């Protein structure tokens, strides 16, 4: 065979999957060489992997199951790389979660796993993972209904992260187990998208769940908007383009976000926006499939959600319109302190725009805030409808995705531990490290409600 791409000469764990592309001398024969740990290398065609994955479809999350398709004029090398990553991600998932399946072991040429209960852990935690005691707890940087977010430092690497700690008891009482597991699933499949927060570790003990995430200390978009009252069109366009890219990516993965608001958009130290908090995401939303759960934040709810009608991905485009409106004018459209009055306005009141904005901006907001979802911008071609709108004509989308554009505003950030852009309401909350990393509880805990929650970031590759 001919050339090999991405050949990594490094130490690997016994259950770590590596995969390389091998292209024949005729440039047509392509196989994918897969190896688990330091075991034997197996070479199979893409079709062989795809056939097997199809037989094991029930074991594979829908968010990663769809095979990559070649785009028009896409280079072969990029297409092979996307296929390689797809094979790698699914293989690692099967090895981590389904080794008790005889078919999986046979396909990957693996021996039967040890049945000793003392050696069983949750999913990917069979690998070397993090624990609560691996971190120093520095500052509180956020809080929610189920827990708080902390700035933490990994004791060994000294790297700064954001750690979200949730109470299992509160999650169960509120019947939110599915939402938390959906958040975990979305996070592990973000593939380091430039505008989606990345998960580095997740783990648990008897009482708590832990998400270890990118630390973004440029502040919430909400706090910057509150301080400045409103943004210019050009600055709003930059942020709206990033949000649209993130939503479009999630939609490609058949995920509806459902909770877009300025509080869930964080700035990094370069001035780029990153979407966070995936607790209300809905998975497995292929094509025009609908759902009907009433959820979201009142100011940004689409009419069909308020009316408890079936809704689809276009609710996210309504939210984008609401956030863009708020960036331009300072408040969400149809805003009222009285929620019932606001809901009535969202459903019945015509959209009114001031005349101090450009025609393309006015047309975009109007298109996104169509009360009839079948007429809403994004209904036909999803992200492409938004990307191709005249308002975004000045945006170089490739440079934006590669983070090569200069942000219109760069927050003042001294270093990774700087909390000057974080609300004092959070920073002043005292931390009790002993309650966050209790010594008396098992590091890992068999808990069927949160089975397969544990994760460690090892082979995250941008596709």
Swiss-Prot record:
Expressed in late embryos just before hatching. At postembryonic stages, expressed in sensory and motor neurons and in the intestine. Highly expressed in the intestine and head and tail neurons. Coiled coil: none annotated. The keyword Iron-sulfur does not apply. It is an enzyme of class 2 (transferase). Keywords: ATP-binding, Cell membrane, Cytoplasm, Developmental protein, Kinase, Magnesium, Membrane, Metal-binding, Nucleotide-binding, Nucleus, Phosphoprotein, Serine/threonine-protein kinase, Stress response, Transferase. Its main location: cytoplasm. ATP binds at residues 141-149, 164. Its EC number is 2.7.11.1. Phosphorylated and activated by pdk-1. It is found in: Cytoplasm; Nucleus; Apical cell membrane. Its cofactor is Mg(2+). It comes from the Eukaryota. GO terms for molecular function: ATP binding; metal ion binding; phosphatidylinositol-3,4,5-trisphosphate binding; protein serine kinase activity; protein serine/threonine kinase activity. SUPFAM superfamilies: Protein kinase-like (PK-like). Residues 135-392 form the Protein kinase domain. GO terms for cellular component: apical plasma membrane; cytoplasm; nucleus; protein kinase complex. Changing residue 126 to K: In ft15; suppresses the defect in expression of vit-3 caused by lin-29 mutation. It catalyses: L-seryl-[protein] + ATP = O-phospho-L-seryl-[protein] + ADP + H(+); L-threonyl-[protein] + ATP = O-phospho-L-threonyl-[protein] + ADP + H(+). Interacts with pdk-1, akt-1, akt-2 and daf-16. Part of a complex containing sgk-1, akt-1 and akt-2. Interacts with let-92 phosphatase regulatory subunit pptr-1. Belongs to the protein kinase superfamily. AGC Ser/Thr protein kinase family. Acts downstream of PI3 kinase age-1 and kinase pdk-1 in the daf-2/insulin receptor-like transduction pathway. Essential role in regulating development, stress response, and longevity. Phosphorylates Forkhead-related daf-16 and the longevity-promoting skn-1 transcription factors, which inhibits their entry into the nucleus and antagonizes their function. Promotes the cytoplasmic localization of the transcription factor pqm-1. Plays a role in the intracellular trafficking of proteins such as mig-14 to the cell membrane, and this may be through positively regulating ceramide synthesis. This is Serine/threonine-protein kinase sgk-1. It comes from Caenorhabditis elegans.
